[in-house]
Amino acid sequence: MLEARVDMLSSNMIISGPAADLGAKEASRPWKKQLNSVPNSGPSARARAQPQPLSIKDKISKWEGKKEPPASDPARQTDGQEDHLPSCKVERRGSELTRTKNGMRLETERLQNDSRARTVCQDTEQLPGPRPIDGQPELSQHRGRELKPSDLRFQSDHLSVLRQVKRLEKALKDGSAGLDPQMPGTCYSPHCLPDKTEEDLPSLESHEKGGVLAAGRRAHHLEVREPGPEISEDWKGQESVYRGSRWYPPKPFINPVPKPRRTFKHAGEGDKDVSPGISFKKEKRNLPPLPSLPPPPPPLPSSPPPTSVNRRLWTGRQRPSADHRKSYEFEDLLQSSSENSRVDWYAQTKLGLTRTLSEENVYEDILDPPMKENPYEDVELHGRCLGKKCVLTFPASPTSSIPDTSTKQSLSKSAFFRQNSERRNLKLLDTRKLSRDGAGSPLRTSPPSTPSSPDDTFFNLGDLQNGRKKKKIPRLVLRINAIYEARRGKKRVKRLSQSTESNSGKVTDENSESDSDTEEKLKAHSQRLVNVKSRLKQAPRYSSLDRDLIEYQERQLFEYFVVVSLHKKQAGAAYVPELTQQFPLKLEKSFKFMREAEDQLKAIPQFCFPDAKDWAPVQEFTSETFSFVLTGEDGSRRFGYCRRLLPGGKGKRLPEVYCIVSRLGCFSLFSKILDEVEKRRGISPALVQPLMRSVMEAPFPALGKTIIVKNFLPGSGTEVIELCRPLDSRLEHVDFESLFSSLSVRHLVSVFASLLLERRVIFIADKLSTLSKCCHAMVALIYPFSWQHTYIPVLPPAMIDIVCSPTPFLIGLLSSSLPLLRELPLEEVLVVDLINDRFLRQMEDEDSILPRKLQVALEHILEQRNDLACDQDGGPLDCVHGPESSSLSEVVSEAFVRFFVEIVGHYPLFLTSGEERSLQREAFRKAVSSKSLRRFLEVFMETQTFRGFIQERELRRQDAKGLFEVRAQEYLETLPSGEHSGVNKFLKGLGNKMKFLHKK
């Protein structure tokens, strides 16, 4: 009898698996379920089993030896069945029988131990046998065990299934089955079960509605088959039932379940595959059960499930069968509802399966519910952040309130759908980077269509700061910005006050400017405009210094290095500077460069020792650093960086100057090179030339980049020198202290205004270092602009005739040359005495060049420079700078940068995009609300300084941003929408204005 049973098992269940014989599958289902459940049913089941003398290995060997399916089942090999289930097939390789369905393979292998074999043998004897089919012997012996009522009910159901098998075989022979198209959800079912035809469903329903028998069978499976705790421990390390070949029980689920074996059944499948272990995992997690579901309408949860439980396995175990999620949507609800209530399993499974088959895009409904345009509109983004971790509240959480309305589409969704959409929202938020204060910053999310709460203003595009990650602006910059805003008022207000006195008690014209233009102001403005335009015609069109460096990118860091010493040509005569060393010895350049270089080499000694006649041998001398600038015939500029020091030896001796000539204007970089030169010169003069050779062979550094120079130093080995080029073209480490100690704030601002209008300025000082530092500091103040004209920080007395040039210049003279200067016929020039802080000669309008409000704000910041330079919390002037403190150079630099931001910071808005970028000049000027500022721009825009600045921005293809660009961007972000950089009514009608300007 057992042989016959094994034969039937192999022919119906295994070999006919690829075919679309539903009856064969259903007939084999009780055998597989019993084989799966008995080994784990507990000690009581094992105690009832009695040992059998028959060896199961022989039966299995005989069963696996079959090569072809029995001839008694011709219907199972028809072509109709092969077309009906193309994804199911049978493979025989040696002793291995494999069945593949949708990427899942259930392999039948040899049993490896005798205990498992005996258990399977005992279980086989307990199973009731169906009626014989096609001459198969009847299995009626049960080895001394009486049939229980549940077994009788099980057998009666099995008989009804066999009748359906015969009906299906008959239909297959007639060719009326197996050719129907599959519904979308069928191919994703776990065990590749075919769908029931419409004519089969009523008959199956009649068999399932057996009344007492069906209810008793459900009660038996729900109550009796509950594994003990020791068996549940054995299940923890087992593989998923979808992957392995052995019939392990499904993994215990969590709430929500991590996708164990399916719990719904196809119509007519019966209640024979209720998966064991439905309720014991619930007790381990101590989680509240999911709500029960009413049968016919789509499942509606009575209360939302807790969102704190994610559907993923957080214990680190892999989720089983992640590739077959599409047909599992309704398993969770059905399985969880079975724990709390005895529902009609057939009605629930039919309902879930019908919904699965009726929706073509079930998975899209889960991930992308169409009820929300913005997935963040229900997410609370503020008030929930702790440190750098954000605690987000979702609509389904117990703390959130959901209106109890049946019209909401979100409530019509099942709990699984809502949980998946919430989990997707959480995943989207997790992928966003958190800002420094811990708040999420979804940069590219679309704003809500109808903002109705203060939270929705996070997506308001009018405020540019809200939609992006907040930048940390230094406190010093914030304080400087506040001073400017307090002085000039708001952008749309043209007057600070209509009264004669302001809030501070000062006269109105001190802090604000009246719009009434007097004849004197108009006349002065017209005269300045004429002078600037006339100088623009006379002066050569110099390009900006940054553009000069473009063709120099592939050259060396410097052009040549020289040493200048003082010598006497004859006794009793004055000392004369002479060139004593030169590197490289030969200038391998073009003829034009060599001719120009020779002229410069002749002039360099005069710049290194402009005070040569005043020198005498000294015993001690502190080294000093200064620089000069050589301007070529074509306007090209070369910088000379000098270090004057006393050579080694004893007794009185004369100093010498080490000079580096380069086209790169970076004082800090070459100052570091000169430090290394001085260190090696103290050891031996022979060590200087190898160092300069290494520096010349180094690549030319790009903006903001660092190059490394290696050089051998006796006693220390190979030293590594890092040379960094600043990101901005302005001079770094400028000594503003010398400038402020020599000039008052009012005089300094007047000189600054004269340089902006490209006037001629001469500095007078008695020390070479003071003269050089003040000239460099003044040039650094006009950043981001570059001084385009003649610039000689220290002018030798032999070249004093240059001050008679009609072109703009900034020249420094030693006080010893002042008598010669008075004898020369000077034109309009500003002569500044740095020794006594006074103007020796001026044009009388220097104080009225700049816009009044901005000038007052600038002077106010410069007056409080020491307070701003100290710690922001306050402290003495000699306080130790902390992490929040700023140096004097930072305060001064930020003050003048903010001044230019107020004037021209809106230029990016008027740069046309395209291959040839150009500035819309008239629109740029008229966009300013202040009339005085517009008048200043009218003159300033005609200078070569402004033209070079705009040409550099027009030609710049890369987005390299210096300090000015960063501050200008921050300034534009603070403006309300529709008012960029002082843009008032003009930008609102920019289109009409541009048409008018085009016609003009």
Curated annotation (Swiss-Prot):
It comes from the Eukaryota. Residues 865-960 form the dDENN domain. Residues 730-863 form the cDENN domain. GO terms for molecular function: guanyl-nucleotide exchange factor activity. SMART domains: dDENN (SM00801), DENN (SM00799), uDENN (SM00800). The modification Phosphoserine is found at residue 544. One of its GO terms (biological process) is retrograde transport, endosome to Golgi. GO terms for cellular component: actin cytoskeleton; cytosol. Residues 249-258, 288-307 have a biased composition (Pro residues). InterPro entries: cDENN_dom, dDENN_dom, DENN_C, DENN_domain_containing_2, Tripartite_DENN, uDENN_dom. Residues 559-708 form the uDENN domain. PROSITE patterns: DENN. Pfam families: dDENN, DENN, uDENN. Keywords: Cytoplasm, Cytoskeleton, Guanine-nucleotide releasing factor, Phosphoprotein, Protein transport, Transport. It is found in: Cytoplasm, Cytoskeleton. Residues 34-43, 496-506 have a biased composition (Polar residues). Residues 1-155, 174-328, 427-464, 491-525 are annotated as: Disordered. Residues 56-70, 79-117, 140-155, 221-237, 427-436 have a biased composition (Basic and acidic residues). Its main location: cytoplasm. The keyword Protein transport applies. Guanine nucleotide exchange factor (GEF) which may activate RAB9A and RAB9B. Promotes the exchange of GDP to GTP, converting inactive GDP-bound Rab proteins into their active GTP-bound form. May play a role in late endosomes back to trans-Golgi network/TGN transport. PANTHER family: DENN DOMAIN-CONTAINING PROTEIN 2, DENN DOMAIN-CONTAINING PROTEIN 2A. This is DENN domain-containing protein 2A. The lineage of its organism: Eukaryota, Metazoa, Chordata, Craniata, Vertebrata. The gene is Dennd2a.
